[in-house]
């Protein structure tokens, strides 16, 4: 809203929206709520009634798909905290259709992130279209929209599989055409391309503080770590590292890239092959345009990092570095 986005185009996600969240979205005319439970549907209905608004909703389904990705970013399996199982969904849909201040406009699902195989996307479509067919037969309900989520991958290292997103979308488009004809169901389709359109647009620069070896491992310590990028700590997500101030140096070492937090697990990478470094060198971590700045914290009282945008060869600061006072400004 502060960025002057059209409110009607906003989709309000989250598996546990508070009453404050719901009221804020409704009174600011958010286009859709992605409802995660019957409790949430009831809350949306009750709050919408106070504003005399019939709120549009997509119901998040859990199709029970294994997307063959890291378990911590697998969001569409039967044990996921997200969404409503297909076995429970019919009763929830029936209730949603009875709520006077809810407009159930369709369904949403998202099976996970960094999915390098097309099969899980196609399997999910088969399952959800079959489900929609059954719902039409039993409840007479046809969705206006189906949001199939995202999960389209990016390559963080050369070891990641080669991908062609055009092939993904062609396969998904062909499958949609097939299923619409089979089931005679034709909802508008939404997708969430997410990191696949922004990850490669960013990199993170760190300054080397020290380089040391303990006889078993080499360590490069940097002025950041899990407080600004927790992905390796959380999922052992791998990155490509480059010595930015001397990229052509062909003398390589193997080292762990260590952060400055008080955790032995505060690493950005292990056994990384990188040019020899010394104190003051700059290391670039590539492909951090998604899930880096948005995941940073003040853990260990580390300052938030600045973000610099490059446009037409010009630099523009779009996020300022936190000052020490910024770390304390909410403390009484």
Regions found by a protein language model. Give the residues of each.
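Short glycine/threonine-rich loop-to-helix capping motif typified by GTGT followed
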Residues: 117-124, 155-167, 198-210, 270-273
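Anionic group-transfer/hydrolysis microenvironments
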Residues: 38, 62-64, 110, 149, ...
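Charged (often Lys/Glu-rich) extended helix/loop segments that serve as interaction or gating elements
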Residues: 171, 177, 184-332
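Flexible, glycine/charged-enriched surface loops at secondary-structure junctions
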Residues: 138-145, 182-190
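Solvent-exposed alpha-helices and their adjacent loops that cap or buttress functional pockets
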Residues: 3-5, 26-27, 49-52, 72-74, ...
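Active-site-proximal beta-alpha core segment in soluble small-molecule metabolic enzymes
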Residues: 1-145, 154, 175
């Amino acid at each position: 809203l502060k960025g002057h986005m059209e409110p009607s185009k906003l989709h309000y996600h989250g598996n546990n929206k508070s009453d404050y969240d719901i009221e804020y979205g409704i009174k600011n005319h958010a286009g859709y709520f992605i409802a995660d439970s019957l409790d949430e549907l009831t809350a949306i209905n009750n709050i919408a009634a106070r504003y005399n608004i019939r709120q549009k909703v997509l119901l998040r389904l859990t199709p029970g798909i294994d997307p063959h990705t890291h378990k911590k970013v697998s969001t569409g399996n039967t044990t996921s905290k997200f969404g409503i199982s297909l076995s429970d969904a019919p009763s929830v849909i029936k209730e949603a259709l009875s709520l006077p201040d809810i407009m159930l406009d369709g369904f949403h699902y998202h099976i996970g992130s960094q999915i390098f195989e097309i099969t899980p996307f196609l399997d999910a479509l088969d399952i959800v279209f079959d489900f929609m067919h059954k719902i039409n037969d039993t409840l007479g309900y046809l969705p206006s929209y189906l949001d199939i989520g995202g999960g389209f991958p990016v390559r963080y290292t050369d070891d990641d599989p080669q991908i062609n997103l055009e092939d993904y979308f062609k396969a998904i488009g062909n499958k949609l055409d097939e299923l619409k004809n089979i089931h005679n169901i034709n909802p508008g389709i939404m997708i969430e391309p997410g990191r696949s359109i922004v990850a490669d647009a960013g990199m993170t620069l760190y300054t080397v503080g020290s380089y040391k070896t303990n006889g078993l491992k080499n360590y490069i310590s940097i002025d950041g770590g899990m407080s600004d990028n927790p992905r390796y700590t959380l999922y052992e997500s791998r990155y490509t590292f480059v010595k930015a101030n001397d990229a052509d140096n062909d003398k390589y070492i193997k080292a762990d890239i260590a952060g400055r937090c008080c955790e032995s697990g505060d690493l950005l990478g292990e056994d990384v092959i990188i040019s020899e470094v010394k104190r003051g060198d700059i290391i670039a971590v590539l492909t951090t345009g998604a899930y880096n700045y948005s995941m940073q914290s003040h853990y260990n009282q580390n300052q938030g990092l600045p973000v610099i945008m490059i446009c037409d060869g010009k630099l523009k600061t779009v996020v300022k570095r936190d000052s020490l006072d910024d770390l304390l400004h909410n403390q009484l």
